[in-house]
Design a protein with these regions (language model features):
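Extracytoplasmic small-molecule ligand-binding "clamshell" domains
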Residues: 19-110, 232-233, 296
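Extended ligand-binding regions for polar small-molecule ligands
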Residues: 22-24, 56-59, 63-73, 137-166, ...
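Periplasmic-binding protein-like
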Residues: 36-39, 126-142, 190-195, 223, ...
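Acidic, polar ligand-binding/catalytic clefts
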Residues: 76-151, 267-277
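Short helix-initiation/N-cap motifs at beta->coil->alpha
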Residues: 78-95, 143-144, 180-200, 223-241, ...
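A ligand-binding cleft/hinge motif common to bilobed small-molecule-binding domains
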Residues: 88, 105-117, 200-223, 237-277
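Flexible hinge/capping segments at coil-to-helix
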Residues: 126, 137-157, 172, 178-187, ...
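Ligand-binding clefts/hinges and TM-proximal coupling segments of bilobed small-molecule sensing domains
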Residues: 160-180, 184-189, 266-273, 300-333
Length: 333
């Protein structure tokens, strides 16, 4: 599973014939792990302000999973963690020189493995968490907006730019096709003015990225009067606040984040419109470090018991991954 001489980690990765087959590194330096700071409870920091005390303090589901990886005897895994506040293109950062691994509730998509030139840039580990898209609505609207199909032209739906929540909402409602191409006549409000989609490849909003002309988009107004207006946010807390004060009628986002917001706001919100399509989240590494990804897969597979332990189990007992790590250390593996 392990390889020699991976570019950028050649001093860290050990050969396949090494005496410790579980070792992912030579233990000479920590792996530089960048984590998204705004996805509570999956991946977040003590402080959302870059440069402040606590910004690089990793919390949540993925933080505990990483700590358990570090605790596996013989794996030789250590992570130096740094917070990342900007979501857009976060999965491509390991292709550069600043990070070895990046996480933050990133949905695994083949389209996210390629750079802008179409060349392979990153690989993902196997999935360690499952997501489903959903709507977060005010409790009094739960019946009216029980399904995506009930959204109408009077509704305004919030999304986070560049997420699967945005891309999937556009696809489900028919504002865009499966590849993210916007329907003819769709109007997009950007800082540079309004653009109108012609149904071609120059007007795309997908989870892996969007057309340059749509950068910084603020609103997506469908050509059909019967479809909802999409309000684009860059901060999830601001988006939930907009739902609370009535500026929008729903938040299109993964179930995990929406249920966390519903819990935080007591009886004010409800989660509806659970998507039948499942998504899986993993960690991103440079394509040249595929062997490291494979080694991580081995240990993540143990910690998650082959996918049987995930977010729900962690939410019930946040020590579940560390318990598995200790079992590995005492030879129960």
């Amino acid at each position: 599973m392990l390889a020699v001489g991976l570019l950028g980690l050649s001093a860290v990765i050990v050969p396949a014939a090494a005496a410790q087959p579980f070792a992912c590194t030579a233990g000479e330096r920590p792996l530089r792990f960048g984590f998204y700071t705004h996805f509570e409870p999956v991946s977040y920091s003590d402080s959302r302000t870059p440069g402040s005390a606590g910004f690089d303090t990793h919390r949540g589901y993925e933080a505990d999973l990483l700590s358990a990886l570090e605790a596996i005897e013989g794996a030789k895994l250590a992570f130096s963690r740094r917070g990342i506040a900007v979501w857009n293109g976060i999965w491509l950062l390991p292709a550069g020189s600043e990070f070895d691994i990046v996480g933050g509730g990133i949905t695994i998509l083949e389209s996210r493995t390629r750079a802008a030139d179409g060349k392979a840039a990153v690989v993902f580990t196997a999935g360690h968490i499952a997501f489903r898209q959903s709507l977060l609505v005010r409790k009094e609207d739960a019946n009216r907006l029980a399904r995506h199909g009930k959204l109408s032209g009077v509704d305004r739906v919030g999304v986070l730019a560049g997420t699967t929540g945005e891309a999937r909402l556009l696809e489900i409602t028919g504002i865009a096709g499966a590849a993210g191409v916007l329907a003819v006549g769709t109007r997009v409000v950007t800082p540079r003015g309004r653009v109108v989609a012609d149904g071609g490849a120059g007007y795309v909003i997908a989870a892996a990225g969007a057309s340059p002309s749509l950068a910084g988009r603020r609103q997506i107004r469908p050509a059909s009067a019967g479809l909802p207006t999409v309000i684009v946010f860059t901060d999830d807390a601001e988006m939930v606040e907009a739902l609370a004060d009535g500026r929008i009628d729903a938040v299109a986002r993964g179930e995990v984040g929406n249920r966390a917001a519903a819990r935080e706001h007591g009886n004010a919100f409800a989660v509806t419109a659970l998507d039948a399509r499942a998504e899986t989240g993993g960690f991103a590494l440079a394509a040249r470090n595929a062997a490291l990804a494979a080694c991580l897969d081995r240990h993540i597979g143990w910690l998650t018991d082959g996918g049987r332990i995930g977010y729900s189990e962690w939410f019930g007992d946040a020590s579940v991954f560390m318990q598995r790590a200790r079992q590995a250390a005492v030879g129960k593996r």
